[in-house]
UniProtKB/Swiss-Prot annotation:
Protein known as: Dihydroorotase
Binding of substrate, residues: 62-64, 94, 317
Gene that this sequence comes from: pyrC
Catalytic activity: (S)-dihydroorotate + H2O = N-carbamoyl-L-aspartate + H(+)
Keywords carried by this UniProt record: Hydrolase, Metal-binding, Pyrimidine biosynthesis, Zinc
EC number: 3.5.2.3
Length: 456
């Protein structure tokens, strides 16, 4: 007896949309085909012609727990993910306490296991704790980072002299380093130079394109020298995309796999410096909003394969915390619930093809972070039934009052999006009919490769 029978749907297969039915048993996709004769099942979903796609994998969220639960917690953050078609997330380490040793890791893991409704990984923090990285790797962290090369929320930025040593240890462990690339020296110099600037786009001026480009160049040199596997978080500039494209081309020319992957966020794709006046403090994030030339470069990078994936960098703050002062306002915007809907709208608007969007939001993240080994990332037989059912014709404006994050606001207010009708996680419907359909704690911890190898 199947657990779920999805009928009257369409899937992307062999480079085209095709009618299909899907049978799900024990949390896995067991059959994909047409005209199945099923005598009974626990649940039949009539998709009525809507698409069934792999659910999103968001490799960059800040669910703020422990320590900052006024902003978000594992339950509210995971509900936002589910409502947006995300079935797997990877949480970042800049909580209170930061996830930098056994005690803090186990504290976060216990909270996530009690509250999350989606599957999750946990990254380990990297500052001056290089002697703790092996322990964290054996405990099951997904990756290390984001390693902050410049100041950001949580105070986890690494000293310049420790950065290469940390990457060397991550290489020795066979782990993955995820990097927040901004040049701290340049940022501090510009902060002093612009201390009298009160313009709304101050934040983009104090962290300009060159700030990211300098840090990316530095990191690429160390990555190449050490041979460490790395991932660049939230690339945002024309210059950085050009560097990444060149390095990937050189690797391909030598028939080598690049040592690194990279992500871009929806806020760097769909918002720009033109939005500073409208958004004010609600447009402040690190790295900051960019100009139209960078946005065009990011879109081109998505389409030509330079950029590997899209991630939300969901970093919520309450409206009251943002305050009126652009300098004092904390950096970060909510985004996990709007990631997939905005990307689906981009497909509808011919910004990128559906096949590319699927790769960017499911398979590429799964492969880069080792989640493919755990059955994540594809709508295929034997993979986890992590799925979203969506009608691509159903464009609607994003509204803060329809979202589930504790933040209570969104920088994407009024922008067209396509929200899912259903979200499934391991064969369980966790979002349907515009409501959460899951209990806290059903989410599964996805152990990292260090834990898996220890058990082999």
């Amino acid at each position: 007896m199947p657990d779920i029978h999805i009928k009257n749907t369409r899937i992307y297969y062999n480079n085209s949309l095709q009618p299909a039915e899907i049978i799900i048993e024990h949390g896995k996709i067991t059959k994909i085909g047409k005209d199945f004769r099923v005598s009974s099942s626990d649940m039949v979903i009539d998709a009525k012609g809507s698409l069934t796609l792999p659910a999103g994998i968001d490799v960059h969220v800040h669910f703020r727990e422990p320590g900052m639960t006024l902003k978000e917690n594992w339950y509210t953050g995971s509900c936002a993910a589910a409502a947006g078609g995300i079935a797997t997330v990877i949480d970042q380490p800049n909580t209170i306490p930061p996830t930098t040793d056994r005690r803090s890791f186990e504290q976060k893991l216990e909270l996530a296991r009690k509250k999350s409704i989606v599957d999750f990984g946990i990254n380990g923090g990297v500052t001056g704790n290089i002697e703790k990285l092996k322990e964290l790797w054996r405990l099951g962290v997904t990756a290390f980072g984001e390693i902050f090369m410049a100041e950001s929320t949580g105070g986890l930025n690494i000293k310049e002299e420790d950065f290469e040593e940390a990457l060397a240890e991550i290489k020795r462990l066979g782990a993955l380093a995820t990097i927040h690339a901004e040049d701290e020296k340049m940022r501090l110099e510009l902060e002093q130079l612009l201390k009298g600037d009160v313009s709304c786009d101050y934040h983009s001026k104090v962290r300009p394109n060159a700030c990211e480009a300098s840090a990316v160049q530095c990191a690429l040199e160390i990555i190449s020298r050490l041979g460490v596997k790395a991932h660049f978080c939230h690339l945002s500039t024309l210059e950085a995309v050009g560097m990444i494209r060149k390095e990937k081309y050189l690797a391909k020319r030598e028939n080598k796999e690049p040592l690194f992957t990279c992500e871009v966020t929806p806020h760097h794709l769909f918002l720009s410096t033109r939005d500073w006046e409208r958004l004010g403090v609600f447009g402040k994030m690190n790295p900051p909003l960019r100009g139209s030339h960078s946005i065009k470069a990011l879109v081109n990078g998505l389409n030509d394969g330079t950029i590997d994936m899209v991630a939300s960098d969901h970093a919520p703050h309450l409206e009251s915390e943002k305050g009126p002062d652009i300098r004092a306002a904390p950096s970060g915007v909510p985004g996990v619930e709007t990631l997939m809907p905005l990307m689906l709208a981009a497909v509808r608007k011919n910004i990128l093809p559906l096949a590319k969007m699927i790769m960017l939001t499911s398979w590429n993240p799964a492969r880069a972070f080792g989640l493919d080994l755990l059955g994540k990332g594809k709508l295929e037989v034997s993979y986890d039934a992590d799925l979203m059912i969506v009608d691509p014709r159903n464009l609607q404006p994003v509204r803060a009052d329809m979202l589930h994050s504790k933040a209570g606001w969104t920088p994407f207010e009024g922008i067209d999006a396509v929200f899912p009708e259903y979200t499934l996680s391991r064969g369980e419907v966790i979002w349907m009919e515009e409501s959460i359909n899951a209990k806290p704690g059903r989410g599964k911890f996805l152990e990292g490769k260090g834990k898996m190898s220890e058990e082999d």
